[in-house]
A protein has these predicted regions:
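Acidic, Mg2+-coordinating phosphoryl-transfer loop and its flanking beta/alpha structural elements
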Residues: 21
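ATP/NTP-dependent adenylation/nucleotidyl-transfer catalytic domains that generate, transfer
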Residues: 1, 5-8, 13-16, 24, ...
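Short alpha-helix adjacent to the SAM-binding motif of class I
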Residues: 28-36
Length: 273
């Protein structure tokens, strides 16, 4: 979407695209990226960032934390982190899901130490990608366009100094459902318009609602709009076909994430001289 808007504003010759897969990336993501770039007629490059991540210890640090929880984890295994709690009440917590080479899955609640290490290690991916973004921006004397939508930006679903860094963020005021609608309006390929939002960070398939949000994005958009427009939990419950208690839980989760991630968008603290 951001690439398409950039082309409309500046023309295809002034837009440059980057596809930055690594060894855990889905091949579908790279293929959709190529399809979009070719549809828009922009120049693009593909860089495999796996060697850089390997050198930084991204995979090693992640796997060490996983093995402290699942000692059998090793070569050929797959993984992802999922959030538990949702709208059913109680405190949200994270679980590690692993799959053996034979296809058997198991899940285990993640202790805080291991959760933080896994997330810190995987955040290398977004930060290395942003380093590549700014290398090419400097090389071309271009600006870096950020991609967070309103839901992601409001709820802190980005990595500080990673995918959260950009010179402009043209869709940060748009709900995710609006982004999809605009993509269809602009005639972007069906593979883009129909793609399910995914973090594409872990080796097992993972939707954004599994990892971070309490509900699928279409429902989260409604909830965020309702909260910002002063609608009661009872009104939200009717719209989302859930109980008022569940709707209140969604509101509480939105507010909690705002508090917990406020620092991500904060400017550095400057001390008086």
């Amino acid at each position: 979407m951001c690439a398409a808007l950039s082309v409309r504003a500046l023309g295809a010759k002034k837009v440059f695209g980057l596809l930055l897969p690594e060894r855990d990336s889905s091949g579908f993501s790279t293929e959709r990226g190529r399809q979009l770039a070719e549809h828009l007629g922009i120049e693009y490059q593909v860089h495999d960032i796996a060697p850089a991540l390997e050198a930084l210890g991204c995979y090693q640090q992640r796997d060490e934390a996983i093995r402290r929880v699942v000692p059998a984890y090793g070569e050929g295994w797959k993984n992802k982190i999922v959030i538990a709690g949702g709208v059913e009440g109680g405190i949200n917590f994270f679980k590690l899901v692993v799959q053996s080479p034979g296809g058997e899955q198991q899940s285990v609640r993640l202790p805080l130490r291991e959760y933080l290490q896994i997330v810190a290690a995987t955040n290398f991916k977004q930060r290395v990608r942003k380093t590549m973004d700014y290398y090419h921006a400097d090389r071309l004397n271009y600006a870096v366009v950020g991609t967070p939508n309103r839901l992601e930006y409001d709820q802190g679903f980005f990595v500080k100094n990673g995918d959260g860094s950009a010179d402009l963020k043209p869709i940060a005021h748009l709900y995710k459902t609006q982004v999809y609608a605009m993509a269809r309006h602009l005639g972007l390929p069906d593979a883009i318009c129909n793609a399910v939002p995914t973090t594409d960070t872990y080796t097992l398939p993972q939707g954004q609602d599994e990892f971070y949000f309490a509900l699928p994005y279409a429902q989260m958009d409604i909830a965020l709009w309702a909260l910002e427009h002063g609608r009661s939990a009872e009104e939200l419950a009717v719209a989302l076909k859930m109980t008022p208690a569940q709707a209140q839980r969604v509101y509480d989760d939105i507010r909690a994430k705002r508090r917990a991630t406020e620092y991500l968008a904060a400017a550095p603290e400057l001390l008086p001289g």
